[in-house]
Amino acid sequence: MKLLLMLLFSGLMTGCRGNSSSASPPKLLLVSFDGFRADYLQNYEFPHLQNFIKEGVLVEQVKNVFITKTFPNHYSIVTGLYEESHGIVANSMYDVNTKKHFSDHNDKDPFWWNEAVPIWVTNQLQDNRSSAAAMWPGTDVPIHNSTPSYFMNYSPSVSFRERLGNVTTWLSSSNPPVTFATLYWEEPDASGHKYGPEDKENMRRVLEEIDEHIGELVHRLKVLGLWESLNVIITSDHGMTQCSKDRVINLDGCLDPSYYTLIDLTPVAAILPKINKTKVYSKLKVCDPHMNVYLKEDIPARFHYQHSDRIQPIILVADEGWTIVLNKSSLKLGDHGYDNSLPSMNPFLAAHGPAFHKGYKHSSINTVDIYPMMCHILGLKPHPNNGTFGHTKCLLVDQWCINLPEAIGIVIGALLVLTTLTCLIIIMQNRVSGPRPFSRLQLQEDDDDPLIG
């Protein structure tokens, strides 16, 4: 019985190794392939990525933050904060207090980034540690007067191989050692916008290229002797959904352009009214049934998208696959930014290294959960954040973890085993102490007349 209970307990929990003290601090490489939708893993072949997953862990779906855009979600990954908390609320922003504008071509002002502390800054505050980055959004900005010790200014023309070469060189030969590094690549986002995620031929081509990049990454780490000691996380910021010219919401047909300033367009449009806010809201409310219109104070709480001066007074959210346009707007065949509860908007996460289990699959975590997990791996004290470390414990070898579905199965199995053993014991006892052979009882009156004379 004691042995059975021990087996049951060990089955409910994943093993705990503990953080052993080591002369060299742990190292972590964070890689993002922009716009890598979670179900691409089921719909396309990824031999190199699947080998990576077999030797590590896979989170099948990561629920990202609203709005599901590139800059906001990349900052949520490295801060563990919702967009309303870290301040990067869109790819295009306007601050009403300072009158400043932000866009993907005008993103170098630390003002926009200083509302949070990204993990590369925290990492460098530790003794004998440095950080490195290959074009991760924000890493070429002096956030809180600090950039990574090694970084590349953003340029989309720089090849993946060059970015990878720089990052792996920094990880293998820097002093003080690089213990945290990031690597960003624009695909499959660019192709998803151009062709749409349902264009199987073109998407297969770009996804095969990404898989080759992952194979190149693994090979490079093995050549440099980093494969067994370096923790690697591969993830993304958002997914992608199909759009078409038949699913268009034309704002110019609903509202006079002189009534408002458009800060961000689609699929989440940010409206700054020039006239009475209620009048603008009322006109937009009846504009199109495929678009939700919210006053800032009425934005659903589940979006965590209210408490920032950079969120405009009126927000428009298109239904999945619908595009908000002006008369002169161009149309993309694929887009993102929609409701983060849509599976098409969610990415995945895969990880390998000494901190992670091997061959383990987990159904889902949140984007904001990645930050506290990374801090744990690096031994850093995290800044206040919206993530939950407990959501990622099952991925890590040094954490106790109750996996509820497995636990239920094990408990049911254990009860069946106990029931079977109990039945067997009862049957065996009955066999050992079976009925005695019949014998005639010697009665008192028989004493004078014994049976055998």
UniProtKB/Swiss-Prot annotation:
The chain crosses the membrane at residues 408-428. GO terms for biological process: blood coagulation; positive regulation of blood coagulation; purine ribonucleoside catabolic process. Zn(2+) 2 binds at D189, H193, H336. Residues 429-453 are cytoplasmic. Its cofactor is Zn(2+). Keywords: Blood coagulation, Cell membrane, Disulfide bond, Glycoprotein, Hemostasis, Hydrolase, Membrane, Metal-binding, Signal, Transmembrane, Transmembrane helix, Zinc. Substrate binds at N91, Y154, D189. Its EC number is 3.6.1.29. It catalyses: P(1),P(3)-bis(5'-adenosyl) triphosphate + H2O = AMP + ADP + 2 H(+). The active site is at T70 (amp-threonine intermediate). This is Bis(5'-adenosyl)-triphosphatase ENPP4. It comes from Bos taurus.
